[in-house]
Amino acid sequence: MPETADQNARAPLAGSADPARTPTSPAPHSPGAAPMREMKADLVVIGAGSAGLSAAAGAAQFGLSVVLYEKGEMGGDCLNTGCVPSKALLSAAKAAAQIREAGKFGIETTPPRVDWEKVKLHVRTAIATIAPVDSQERFEGLGCTVIREHAKFAAPDTIISPSTRVKARRIVIATGSRAFIPPIEGLAKIPYLTNETLFDLPDFPEHLVILGGGPIGMEMAQAFVRLGAKITVIEMDKALGRSDRAHAEIAIETLRAEGVTILEGYKATKVEQEGQTIRIHTEPKDGAAWIVEGSHLLVAVGRQTVFDGMDLEKGDVDHDRKGILVGDTLRSRSNRRVWALGDAAGREQFTHIAGWHASVFARRAFFKQRTTADSLPVPAVTYTSPEIAQLGLTEAEARKQHGDDITTPSFRFEESDRAIAEADTEGEVKLIVRKGKLLGASIIGKDAGDLIQLVSVAMSNGLGVKELTNFISPYPTRAEGVKRAANAHYADVVFGKSAKRLVGLLQRIP
C-alpha cells in the first residue's frame, strides 16, 4: 500500500471528525477538582514529533479513536530545536558565504554584515511557518484528542496523566531523544549549549567550541564560522566517522579551509570557566595535551532516548539505554500492545526514519501487512557544504563483507557541465556494486541529499546498477552524475576489446 501514515502528518487538512468516536480533551486535573476522566481509545500515542504525529494522523483518518499526548512543543525536536532551525541557520550562513564568493563570477561586493537578531528571526519564521501543520488545532481537526500533559503507564494497557486515564487497544511510544551529556569533569557546572538552547543565544558567540564531530557538530561549525564566529571542533575519533572516509575528508578539509579548527583524536577530560572564558582540557590519542579556550561550548556528542517518568515497568515494557526492546516489526517484545517508533525504537535517529516507522506501524497494525522497519535502505545526509549523502553500505563496509568482489564506479563533478557552469565542482558520485547489485552509494557535493534519492528509489525497488543507466537524464543537471557513475560500471564491457570485435563483425552485415 502507499506510505499513507508517513504522509498524513503533513497532508492537507482532512474533513471534520466524527463526533460519535471523538472524545473531547479534558480540563487539567487538580486536587479538589472533578475525578480523573476515564477514556477508551483505539490508539494512544505518546509524543508529538514526526513519528507520533504521522501515526496519530494516519489512525485518525482511518476512522480510529486516537489520544495524542505531548507535554512539550507540538512538532517535537525536529521542528523546534533540530532539523528545521538548523537548516534555516545553515541557509543564512550559506547566503553570507555566497556573498563572499561572488567575486569569482565577476560580481564585486562588500563583506556581509551579520545581524544575529535578524538571523534568529529567520530561524523562528521558518519554525512558525511549518508549525500549523503540526499544531494541536490541526490534529484536533483530524479527530485526535490532544492532551498536553506528561503521560505514563498505569498498567500494560493503560496510560494516565494528571487529568486523564486512557485504556488503549494499542499504544505508540514516540518520545524521541535529547542531547547526550557526557560525564566530563566540571561540565555540569558551566552553561553549556545543546541543540535545545543554541538557536536562542542572546549574543552571537565570539568563539564557539563544539564537542563532537558528527553531522550536528560539523553542520553547526560551518554555519557559525560563515556567520563570523571562531570555531573549534573536538572529536574523540574521526570527524564524520560514519560517512565514506574519502568523502568525509573532503568535507573536513573544506571546513578547515573556511577557518574551522578540527581536533581529531582528542578527548575532552575537564571543563572549567573563568569569567567569560570556558576552558576545555583535552587528551590526544597521540601527542601533547591541548587546552582549548572559548566563549561558548556546544555539546553535540550524540543523542539518548527519553523515557523519563513513564513508568515503563508498570506497562511491562522492556527497554535498555538505546530504546524500547523491539524487533524489526517495531513491536515491544514484552508487551504486544506497545509499539516504539522513531528514536524510541533504538535505531537510526533520523526524522525520515521516524516517518517510515509510522508507516510500518500503520501497515502492520491496521492492514496486517508484513512490512518491517528494515525492509528499505536508509539514506543519511550531512548538510555541510559540500553535502554528504550516504545509502546502504560504504565502500569500507562492503569490502569488509565481500572483499575485492565489489566495484566502485564513480563520476566526479569536475566533469559535470552543470557544476562547471556553477563554478562548484567539488565532489563525486560513488556507487557500491557487487555483480550488478547496488549495495550502497555515497555522494559528496552540492545537493547530494537530493541526488541520493535516485539510488534510493532503485535500491528500494530491487533495481540494479543497469537500471540506473536506462533513463533519459535532462541536460545539464547534477543528477546526470548518478547515471554517468552507473555507465562507468559498464565502460570496460561496452568499449572493451570484445565489444570492438563484435561491432567490427556487425559492420560486415549489409
Each model region followed by its residue ranges:
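Glycine-rich flavin
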Residues: 2-7, 12-41, 57-64, 69-204, ...
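Beta1/beta-strand and adjacent pyrophosphate-binding region of the FAD-binding site
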Residues: 37-51, 204-211
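Short hydrophobic core segments
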Residues: 44-46, 151, 166-176, 211, ...
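Flexible, glycine-rich terminal cap/loop adjacent to redox cofactors
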Residues: 46-72, 77, 84, 88-95, ...
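Conserved phosphate-binding and hydrolysis motifs of nucleotide-dependent enzymes
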Residues: 47-52, 176, 212-217, 302, ...
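Glycine-rich dinucleotide-binding loop and its adjacent helix/turn
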Residues: 83, 175-234, 258-261, 313-334
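A structured beta-alpha segment of the ubiquitous adenosine-cofactor-binding alpha/beta core
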Residues: 162-164, 268, 281-291, 303
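FAD-site-proximal beta/loop scaffold in flavoenzymes
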Residues: 188-204, 291-367, 454, 469
